[in-house]
Amino acid sequence: KVVTALVPDAFNSKSARVVIVFGEKHDLLWDEIYNAFEGKLAREKVDSFKAGAGTVLFLYDEETVNNLQEKFSDYADNFPVWANQANGMLQLAVWSALRELKVGASLQHYNPVIDERVKELFDIPSQYKLVAQMPFGGIVSEPDPKDEEDIEQRVSIVR
């Protein structure tokens, strides 16, 4: 809750929504994700997420975004982009907070295939748009090191 409250967003919109799923509901979520893809996902991969302690569902309120688009029409095209950017910042903040607590996590994107089923399972309002799923739990292993790259290709410093 603290992390969600602290992450900024454009126009102080507070469009981000978080649902944290534990226990049998967490298991059901991952079984439903597997079923939604009709065997196209590796069962072992889905079971690795299911083995976690829980899952954070990241969403944003499209009604909030629509209201801002109407109120500030000059920026209308930007509000969905800004909602996703704010959601990304929230995802990183939650992931970092979990890591500080020595809890492992990964970020998954099985939407839009699972969107409607997730809303049904957890009584999520229809105007909420699912963005990502973050299963979390014990740290099984450290992530593989990232490939070396020429960071100068991605970062420019102008003086």
Region annotations inferred by a language model:
Residues 4, 72-119:
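Small-aliphatic-rich amphipathic alpha-helix that forms the alpha element of a beta-alpha
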Residues 32-37, 70-79, 122:
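Short, surface-exposed loop/helix-turn segments at secondary-structure junctions
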Residues 64-69:
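Short acidic/His/Gly/Ser-rich catalytic and metal-binding motifs that mark active-site loops
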Residues 62, 111-115, 140:
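Acidic, glycine-rich active-site loops and adjacent beta-strand->loop/helix elements
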Residues 23, 59-63:
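Beta-hairpin (beta-strand-turn-beta-strand) motif
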Residues 130-159:
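C-terminal helix-cap and adjacent tail motif
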Residues 1-55, 158-159:
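N-terminal amphipathic, basic helical "cap/leader" segment at the start of enzyme domains
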Residues 55-59, 134:
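Active-site-flanking beta-strand signature of metal-NTP-handling nucleotidyl enzymes
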